[in-house]
A protein has these predicted regions:
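Short acidic/histidine- and often glycine-rich active-site loop of Leloir-type glycosyltransferases
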Residues: 277, 320, 334-344, 348-349
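Acidic donor-binding loop of glycosyltransferase active sites
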Residues: 300-314, 327
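Nucleotide-activated donor-binding/catalytic signature segment of Leloir-type glycosyltransferases, i.e.
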Residues: 276-297
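Donor nucleotide-sugar binding/catalytic pocket of nucleotide-sugar-dependent glycosyltransferases
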Residues: 125, 135, 152-229
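N-terminal strand-loop element at the rim of the active site
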Residues: 7-13, 25-91, 272
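Conserved donor-binding/catalytic core segment of Leloir-type glycosyltransferases
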Residues: 198, 231-249, 255-259, 267
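Short glycine-rich donor-binding/catalytic loop of glycosyltransferases
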Residues: 310, 327, 331-338, 352-353
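A short, well-ordered alpha-helix in the C-terminal region of glycosyltransferases
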Residues: 346, 357, 364, 371-385, ...
Length: 399
């Protein structure tokens, strides 16, 4: 099978790139041909044999002259269609697997795939993995960045609310462009050509189903995670938070609770805009951003970890990773988080944003070592899809 993986970035940049690289490797290991289409970039590490890519678009840098065309290019890209057609004609894929494409590549690429199918008579499936809520929310988070409140006003296609709420970077102009992009493609009905939409949680699926164009085409598949070796680890007396220090992650609520629990030792591992609020608190040790073996050691030795998110998280790796390393999770009851925790076996849930409930749950776990030990042992039996198991599932979607 020939699979064309499409993503705006073709270099390591975030979770969606990790996803496409590992999926591509798995497909090749099973004998499939894989090529990639996206933006050209000096760090690009995958591609296609005709060397066809779109020009890079830098929303944070670049010349003022080049930015003048961005409002149009972010809605419709003729260049993306022309360059993609070169790849389609040469590679002749059986599957086009779309990932993040809005704004830089634009949904116009879907129209080109449809046109190519009609003109060549080829049977090529269009699969889309949703890494965020972009297709139902122009700012992709279902969260207003100005109020830091979760928001579902755009669900069902009411995208004017994006502009009303200044939901993209707090800017009326940028939010208007986001609204126009969403309204334009709603009017074109382009997303109806997607054969299957892969959602990384049942929660995300429920939100995506609000769009009638693909409500019958969604399937929930949790993200894959590398299998790790189980190790009996002596626990130390600290509670771990590892992740971004930002408002939507619930860090403000967690810090408030930490101050009210001076006898509980917390370790925070990460960076972010709220880092200054983390520093200077006696029972919080900020060890900064950690990765690899250092992060693994922190996770394994923690009595339990906390995932206090206050936005609609989809399938956070941190929640899976903690349990895979034998550390129970106290997670916020929001988004896809509850789907990943075996409540009463490998962790507990608390009401997202509720400091009092979070405090009670921390006190309960901290004061009951035997319960934490039991939860930790139960983590040995928890399983999430590896890339091999995910491959088997995705082949059923492709076929």
């Amino acid at each position: 099978m020939r699979v064309l993986i499409i993503n705006k970035f073709l270099y390591p940049n975030g979770g969606s790139e990790t996803y496409i690289f590992k999926l591509g490797e798995a497909l090749e290991q099973h004998g499939h041909e894989v090529q990639y289409f996206g933006m050209e970039h000096e760090g690009r590490c995958v591609g296609n044999r005709v060397n066809a890519y779109t020009s890079g678009m830098d929303f944070h840098g670049g010349s003022k002259l080049s930015k003048l065309t961005y409002p149009i290019k972010t809605i419709y890209s003729k260049e993306a269609r022309v360059q993609l057609r070169k790849v389609l004609d040469d590679f002749k894929p059986d599957v086009c697997h779309l990932n993040n494409f809005n704004y830089q590549l634009t949904p116009s690429i879907i129209l080109e795939i449809v046109k190519w199918r009609k003109e060549t008579g080829r049977d090529c499936k269009i699969i889309f993995t949703a890494h965020d809520y972009q297709l139902v929310c122009p700012n992709h988070m279902l969260n207003n960045p100005n109020t830091h409140q979760n928001c579902e006003k755009c669900l069902g296609g009411h995208f004017v609310n994006c502009m009303k709420g200044k939901c993209i970077h707090g800017s009326t102009a940028k939010s208007a462009i986001g609204m126009m992009e969403a309204e334009f493609w709603k009017w074109k009905g382009t997303y109806k050509y997607i054969d299957t939409m892969i959602c990384c949680s049942e929660f995300m699926k429920s939100k995506m189903d609000s769009n009638p164009l693909f409500a019958t085409k969604t399937v929930a598949m949790h993200n894959f995670i590398d299998k790790v070796e189980w190790k009996e680890t002596e626990k130390k007396d600290y509670v771990l938070y590892f992740g971004r220090f930002s408002e939507e992650k619930g860090i403000g609520t967690l810090i408030k609770v930490c101050k009210e629990l001076p006898d509980v030792q917390f370790i925070f591992a990460g960076t972010g805009p709220l880092e200054e609020t983390v520093n200077g608190i006696k029972n919080i040790k900020n060890v900064g951003f950690q990765k690899g073996e250092a992060l693994e050691k922190l996770i394994r030795e923690a009595r339990f970890s906390i995932y206090p998110s206050e936005w609609y998280e989809n399938c956070p790796f941190s929640v899976m990773e903690s349990q895979m390393y034998g550390t129970p999770v106290l997670g916020a009851n929001i988004g896809g988080i509850p789907e990943l925790i075996q409540v009463g076996k490998t962790g507990k849930l608390f009401e997202s944003g509720n400091a009092e409930d979070l405090k009670k749950k921390i006190e309960k776990l901290w004061g009951d070592k035997k319960l934490c030990e039991a939860y930790s042992k139960n983590c040995k039996n928890i399983s999430f899809d590896t890339i091999d198991e995910y491959y088997e599932k995705i082949m059923k979607v492709y076929q």
